[in-house]
Amino acid sequence: MLGLHVGTLISLFLCILLEPIEGSLMQPCQPINQTVSLEKEGCPTCLVIRAPICSGHCVTKEPVFKSPFSTVYQHVCTYRDVRYEMIRLPDCPPWSDPHVTYPVALSCDCSLCNMDTSDCTIESLQPDFCITQRVLTDGDMW
């Protein structure tokens, strides 16, 4: 019985001791500049730009006992304040609208994932993924 109590105290001590180290290694939820691809059906090229997106660590808890009567809500790093910008894709055919609107993160927050504005899947595509030919904003092909 004493061994179990001492083991629990040691585990608790290590958690308290290592928590500041763990927190300092993880980036907080904040806007970061990221390579993002912009493409549209009907246009043959994918434009690659740098834009602020929300990224970082949000504290979450996974309950040990999962009750069928309670719901677990996981918080993710997502947009708090956002501005939308428009850019023109090159080489689009004359009958298609070459303009694409994309979000620019002004501030971020740890909150529930909004399926209307965010990709809430576990294994999503990277922000710079392109289906069509990639073109950098300075005109160089990838």
From Swiss-Prot:
What domain of life does the UniProt record list for this protein's source?
Eukaryota
**Glycosylation sites recorded in the entry for this protein:** N33
Mind telling me which PROSITE patterns this protein's record contains? Answer: GLYCO_HORMONE_BETA_1, GLYCO_HORMONE_BETA_2
| Localization per Swiss-Prot or TrEMBL | Secreted
Report the GO molecular function annotations: hormone activity
Query: CDD domains given for it?
Result: GHB_like (cd00069)
Q: Does the keyword Zinc-finger apply?
A: no
Note the Pfam families from the entry.
Cys_knot
Q: What residue stretch is flagged as signal peptide? A: 1-23
Q: Which UniProt keywords apply?
A: Disulfide bond, Glycoprotein, Hormone, Secreted, Signal
One Gene Ontology CC term in the entry: extracellular space
Q: Does the keyword Disulfide bond apply?
A: yes
Q: InterPro entries under this entry?
A: Cystine-knot_cytokine, Glyco_hormone_CN, Gonadotropin_bsu, Gonadotropin_bsu_CS
Disulfide bond residue pairs: C29-C77, C43-C92, C46-C130, C54-C108, C58-C110, C113-C120
Q: Name one GO biological process term.
A: testosterone secretion
Q: What is said about its interaction partners and assembly?
A: Heterodimer of an alpha and a beta chain.
**Record's family?**
Belongs to the glycoprotein hormones subunit beta family.
Q: What does this protein do?
A: Involved in gametogenesis and steroidogenesis.
Give the protein's recorded name: Gonadotropin subunit beta-2
